């Protein structure tokens, strides 16, 4: 009887230990996951706002070749847009890096100082001539003060992208605003994932943005 009691006690101890070890394993796994999440950075795109398309009589242009100018305040975002536009439309898109390499220094300086759609309209004809394109997409990113997030381990940076598409003749064809938030951890943003998210965002809202009216037909959708 005493031996049986000892056996039962031993089994109880082993069972309790197994549960405790399993719990510790789960806690350790959760700790690793939380630590990794705390280090990661990401970008969240909100809904487009204040979209506008030129009336039919002003947008009778064929946008076969487009250039994406370096965005004021965020060069990387301009590169993302160039990549995504080449995937989302059937147009030939020239990247900001190539635009910069083909422009004289004084024009590049003007680009960095551009703050309004009128500045972009004034610059578009010269850029279009120098790069041989039918239109230029301009962008300007304005940010708000960063906020602490994830118990102070990350920074949350709300930002807004102002977009202007101007024809080679200096006609404003389309404009919109895209609010987005960058959450900064110790790791850099996964740019491929961010571009996939942006592609999905654009193709999902292409019609309501007025791209169909401009002849910018979406030819790819993100999976």
Segments (PLM) and residue ranges:
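Solvent-exposed, acidic/flexible segments
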Residues: 74-78, 113-121, 152-156, 184-195
């Amino acid at each position: 009887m005493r031996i049986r009691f000892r056996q039962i006690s031993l089994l109880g101890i082993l069972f309790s230990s197994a549960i405790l070890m399993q719990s510790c394993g789960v806690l350790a796994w959760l700790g690793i996951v939380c630590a990794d999440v705390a280090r990661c950075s990401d970008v969240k795109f909100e809904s487009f706002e204040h979209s506008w398309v030129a009336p039919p009589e002003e947008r009778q242009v064929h946008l076969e070749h487009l250039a994406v100018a370096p965005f004021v305040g965020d060069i990387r975002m301009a590169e993302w847009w160039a990549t995504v536009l080449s995937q989302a439309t059937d147009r030939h898109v020239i990247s900001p890096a190539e635009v910069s390499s083909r422009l004289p220094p004084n024009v590049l300086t003007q680009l960095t100082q551009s703050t309004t759609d009128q500045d972009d309209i004034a610059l578009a004809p010269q850029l279009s001539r120098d790069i041989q394109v039918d239109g230029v997409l301009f962008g300007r990113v304005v940010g708000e003060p960063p906020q602490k997030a994830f118990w102070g381990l990350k920074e949350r940076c709300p930002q807004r992208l102002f977009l202007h598409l101007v024809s080679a003749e200096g006609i404003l064809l389309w404009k919109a605003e895209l609010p987005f938030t960058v959450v900064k951890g110790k790791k850099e943003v996964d740019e491929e994932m961010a571009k996939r998210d942006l592609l999905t965002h654009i193709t999902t809202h292409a019609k309501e943005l007025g791209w169909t009216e401009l002849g910018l037909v979406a030819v790819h959708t993100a999976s």
